[in-house]
């Protein structure tokens, strides 16, 4: 068989196996060494094999776009790149996929062995490039006729199962060396073995022991089905839920759901009311705030953490961790009868809400009020994507629970990069669209990914809270280093706006300086298909100062 035919056959087998393991989306960056893989994917997409191609010129943004596709579809997604520096550009997204247990299939084309360690162009060690982060890696040999059938497919099956099987998942890496010629090949499909059975779903949690009311639930990172199961059990037992933004419950109005746990725990009355719980059950990990994890460590006499991940999500090592299917485990905890309300909790919540409303009414327009306004104008079904750093804290503290909108977060490693790309990918599979709320540094990090919004088929509104630098550092001890060091080394003001960036990528743009103009712009943007940009001018330091002042007021109650 000719080399080009071997390349085409090898690549075709790989794409067929991906499809057999549930991959419906393939993301492709431009490159020549990866041509056989890209062409094999295109052939299958063009002939209607239920495979969708996504292309982008920037590998870094493309990989984050794939994470958005995964978060919305909850299916594995493949990313194909050429050799050389293209592959390391995937590293930030692979790290996020690892920490968030997302089934990202990374496929890197490579030079064959004879072109390594000899000064050949665009050749670098790639086999172990993502080794600490991936669940499995497969370094294939160059295509060989004798290996095209059962050997290749069995190796692919074993590796792909780590990303696509039932139970805990995560990223995998396939390194595919290919010899020239890379173009003009004809596929000769080998006889392939049948797909192996999927891994059995994770079993339900073992009994947690007898429930000791009063109970308290904490909802961390959950998918919609898990969140619904937790809420069903809580409603049946009148059990309060401290809901993180990533829980899918934070924006839902329900008597059991307590949003803004950080504010509640800042008050003595709130801590006293919650402290009456004798058993705390946490579903999912990666909590956003600082007060809630600290309170759990100090208070919870009997604390369980139920997680679907196969790595620890309890940084303080205080909880009894149960690895189980979260939805099944939550339903298994359904109590026979509701528990009485925690004394003093309703009164504490009312005081917090009144204090928060008064603070917003009396302060200049900044990140807290902007976040509150955005949450009120979200159409039903539209997802709110809370960017990292200051925006997710503002969502946690100030968002209003209304329609129960999905809330998307990227808290695996909590980076500020790739957020626009991830939102664009999420919007592709979420017909109700998404509003992304990010800071100006996050927007500058991922400016290239605005190109992905130009091709978005569903609404994707990017709201940039522009406070001219890293506003989160106003809340951190970096401030104690003095104003000059704080400004030069941490906040790093830049003076940039985003109107010309929006114009460069042919996106509708609004600039807002108050709540009314923000609401009007957001309502209009939410009616438009495709991408748009809303820039909110926030006075530097104002939002973080308002947050700090509100905490001081609550602590004094």
UniProtKB/Swiss-Prot annotation:
Disulfide bonds: none annotated. Pathway: Quinol/quinone metabolism; 1,4-dihydroxy-2-naphthoate biosynthesis; 1,4-dihydroxy-2-naphthoate from chorismate: step 2/7; Quinol/quinone metabolism; menaquinone biosynthesis. It catalyses: isochorismate + 2-oxoglutarate + H(+) = 5-enolpyruvoyl-6-hydroxy-2-succinyl-cyclohex-3-ene-1-carboxylate + CO2. GO terms for biological process: menaquinone biosynthetic process. The keyword Transmembrane does not apply. It holds the Pfam family TPP_enzyme_M_2. Catalyzes the thiamine diphosphate-dependent decarboxylation of 2-oxoglutarate and the subsequent addition of the resulting succinic semialdehyde-thiamine pyrophosphate anion to isochorismate to yield 2-succinyl-5-enolpyruvyl-6-hydroxy-3-cyclohexene-1-carboxylate (SEPHCHC). This is 2-succinyl-5-enolpyruvyl-6-hydroxy-3-cyclohexene-1-carboxylate synthase.
């Amino acid at each position: 068989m000719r080399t080009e035919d071997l390349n085409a056959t090898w690549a075709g087998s790989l794409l067929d196996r991906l499809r057999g393991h549930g991959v419906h989306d393939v993301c492709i960056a431009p490159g020549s060494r990866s041509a056989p893989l890209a062409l094999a994917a295109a052939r299958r997409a063009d002939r209607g094999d239920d495979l969708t191609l996504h292309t982008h010129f920037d590998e870094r943004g493309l990989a984050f776009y794939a994470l958005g596709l995964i978060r919305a579809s909850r299916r594995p997604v493949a990313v194909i790149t050429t050799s050389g520096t293209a592959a390391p550009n995937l590293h930030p997204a692979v790290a996020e996929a690892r920490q968030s247990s997302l089934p990202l299939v990374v496929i890197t084309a490579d030079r064959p062995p004879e072109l390594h360690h000899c000064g050949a162009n665009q050749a670098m060690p790639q086999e172990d490039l993502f080794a600490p982060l991936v669940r499995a890696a497969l370094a294939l040999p160059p295509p060989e006729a004798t290996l095209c059938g059962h050997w290749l497919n069995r190796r692919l099956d074993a590796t792909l199962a780590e990303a696509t099987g039932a139970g805990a998942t995560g990223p995998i890496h396939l390194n595919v060396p290919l010899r020239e010629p890379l173009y003009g090949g004809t596929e000769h499909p080998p006889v392939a073995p049948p797909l192996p059975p999927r891994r059995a779903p994770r079993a339900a949690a073992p009994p947690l022991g007898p429930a000791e009311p009063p109970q308290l639930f904490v909802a961390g990172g959950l998918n919609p089905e898990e969140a619904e199961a937790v809420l069903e059990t809580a409603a049946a037992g009148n059990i309060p839920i401290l809901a993180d933004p990533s829980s899918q419950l934070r924006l839902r109005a329900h008597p059991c759901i307590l949003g803004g746990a950080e504010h509640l725990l800042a008050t003595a009355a709130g801590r006293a009311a919650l402290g009456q719980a004798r058993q705390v059950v946490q579903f999912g990990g990666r909590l956003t705030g600082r007060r809630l994890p600290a309170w759990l460590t100090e208070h919870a006499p009997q604390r369980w953490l139920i997680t679907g991940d196969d790595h620890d999500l309890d940084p303080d090592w205080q909880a009894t961790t149960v690895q189980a299917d979260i939805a099944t485990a939550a339903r298994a905890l359904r109590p026979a009868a509701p528990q009485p309300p925690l004394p003093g909790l309703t009164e504490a919540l009312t005081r917090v809400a009144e204090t928060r409303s008064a603070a917003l009414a009396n302060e200049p327009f900044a990140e807290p009020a902007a976040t509150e306004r955005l949450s009120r104008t979200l159409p039903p079904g539209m997802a709110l994507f809370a960017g990292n750093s200051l925006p997710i804290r503002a969502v946690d503290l100030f968002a209003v629970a209304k329609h129960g909108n999905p809330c998307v977060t990227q808290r695996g490693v909590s980076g500020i990069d790739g957020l626009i790309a991830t939102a664009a990918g999420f919007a592709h599979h979420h017909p109700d669209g998404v509003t992304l709320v990010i800071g100006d540094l996050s927007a500058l990090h991922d400016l290239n990914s605005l190109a992905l919004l130009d091709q978005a088929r569903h609404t994707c509104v990017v709201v940039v809270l522009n406070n001219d630098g890293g506003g989160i550092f106003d809340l951190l001890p970096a401030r104690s280093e003095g104003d000059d060091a704080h400004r030069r080394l941490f906040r790093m003001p830049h003076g940039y706006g985003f109107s010309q960036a929006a114009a460069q990528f042919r996106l509708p743009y609004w600039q807002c300086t108050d709540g009314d103009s923000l609401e009007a712009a957001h309502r209009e943007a939410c009616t438009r298909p495709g991408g748009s940009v809303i820039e909110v001018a926030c006075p530097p330091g104002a939002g973080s100062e308002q947050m700090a002042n509100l905490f001081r007021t609550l602590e004094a109650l």
